[in-house]
A protein has these predicted regions:
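Glycine-centered hinge/linker elements that transmit conformational signals in sensory
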Residues: 1, 39-71
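Paired acidic/hydrophobic, glycine-rich loop segments that form the ligand-binding mouth/hinge
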Residues: 9, 61, 88-92, 112
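Extracytoplasmic/periplasmic substrate-recognition and gating elements
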Residues: 55, 59-65, 77, 101-167, ...
Length: 243
């Protein structure tokens, strides 16, 4: 960015929606904190790591490393910006890799994958996605559904889905498949990132808690409140939700 090769250094999901929650989870964990500890009900937003995570995101915008428009970015806007060569780094989900290798991508064959940044001495974090397969207890065809699950999660199916559509496999064996790694070396980096996957807070009140975080964090990123004020309000409101 300083050399003028790209307009921006980093693009991510800054819109007031679930993507912002995922970004924040990775940052607070990377600063050594925790959004919410389900076992104790402790909220960590107004603690040093929570404030530092918010300030780090806010500073990206204030310093011009991220565009101010990032507060309106979802996955697609971030991907389009990076895909067109407008930013040096991007935070996104693994599916983006396949998109970046298409013929209309300005960065085709010029992209690498790494883990999220973290403060020195802390481990990086990667928000666990929400896709999964489930069987309703009242299903009329449970046996055939289970067979479909087995087929979709088999090594052969996951190899096909990854090589053709970029869907990240869940079978550990595929991350050590030498033939697959030879043709898709990025898979090793994806596997490393997955080792740091973290779930969003496991609480029946998650929808309400995430709404609080998104509103308060968005308020800070758009310049209405300071990081300290925003997280103080977010923690207080979250505690009220959990009462």
């Amino acid at each position: 960015q300083d050399s003028g090769r790209v307009p921006y250094g980093y693009v991510w999901q800054g819109r007031q929606y679930e993507g912002l929650s995922c970004v924040y989870l990775e940052m607070i964990e990377g600063f050594g904190g925790e959004w919410l500890t389900p076992e104790t009900g402790r909220v960590g937003l107004d603690q040093a790591p929570g404030i530092a995570a918010t300030r780090w995101l806010d500073d990206l915008i204030e310093a011009g490393i991220s565009p101010r428009a990032v507060t309106n970015f979802s996955e697609s806007e971030a991907l389009q910006s990076f895909k067109s060569g407008q930013a040096a780094f991007m935070r996104n989900w693994p599916y983006a890799w396949a998109e970046l290798q298409k013929n209309d991508s300005a960065v085709n064959n010029k992209v690498g994958i790494t883990t999220m940044v973290a403060q020195a001495g802390e481990k990086p974090a990667a928000t666990l996605g929400s896709w999964g397969l489930s069987l309703l207890s009242g299903s009329a065809r449970p046996e055939s559904t289970v067979e479909a699950f087995k087929f979709l999660t088999s090594e052969d199916s996951q190899r096909y889905l990854y090589t053709n559509f970029g869907y990240t496999p869940t079978q550990n064996a595929l991350f050590n498949d030498q033939d697959l790694l030879q043709n898709h070396p990025s898979l090793a980096s994806i596997g490393e990132a997955l080792s740091f996957a973290r779930s969003r807070p496991e609480t029946p009140l998650y929808a309400q808690a995430r709404d609080v975080l998104q509103r308060k964090l968005s308020s800070t990123l758009t310049g209405l409140t300071s990081p300290t004020q925003g997280m103080e309000q977010a923690e207080r409101s979250t505690e009220q939700v959990l009462e």
